[in-house]
Curated annotation (Swiss-Prot):
GO cellular component entries: cytosolic small ribosomal subunit
Keywords associated with the record: Ribonucleoprotein, Ribosomal protein
Protein name: Small ribosomal subunit protein uS9
InterPro entries from the UniProt entry: Ribosomal_Su5_D2-typ_SF, Ribosomal_uS9, Ribosomal_uS9_bac/plastid, Ribosomal_uS9_CS, Ribsml_uS5_D2-typ_fold_subgr
Protein family (similarity comment): Belongs to the universal ribosomal protein uS9 family.
GO molecular function, one term: RNA binding
SS bonds (residue pairs): none
Species of the source: Stutzerimonas stutzeri (strain A1501)
Listed GO biological process terms: translation
Length: 130
């Protein structure tokens, strides 16, 4: 491993992303696929690019990501969290603007479990008075 590499782990819902930041030209590779090929939705691609655009480092790094678990939205959020952490390990002064934007904090919301006697987590069977 080269010393010029920065690493960050990101998590969101059940998705986990391992992000490697290397000096480069702005190429983003996720599970050995280009960003545009990996995410079909523009919103997911936008979420991934947010920390880079905020810190104006989009053209400074090549980003290599391995992401596991979750769905499209969860994986995009996990990658964003990982990129944020990797940027902070690269330059601690970036923490303040990233925190203001809300990218540093791990989104702790998880799916609520289904309860016995209920159809879903909170949906109850229809109540009959008589």
């Amino acid at each position: 491993m080269s010393a010029t590499q920065n690493y960050g782990t990101g998590r969101r819902k059940t998705a986990t992303a391992r992000v490697f930041l290397r000096p480069g030209t702005g190429k983003i590779s996720i599970n050995n696929r280009e960003l545009d090929n990996f995410f079909g939705r523009e919103t997911a691609r936008m979420v991934v690019r947010q920390p880079l655009e905020l810190t104006e480092t989009a053209e400074k790094f090549d980003i290599y990501v391995t992401v596991l678990g979750g769905g499209v939205s969860g994986q995009a959020g996990a990658i964003r969290h990982g990129i944020t952490r990797a940027l902070i390990s690269y330059d601690e002064s970036l923490r303040s603007p990233l925190r203001k934007a809300g990218f540093v904090t791990r989104d702790a919301r998880e799916v609520e479990r289904k309860k016995v006697g209920l159809r879903k987590a909170r949906k109850r069977p229809q109540y009959s008075k008589r």
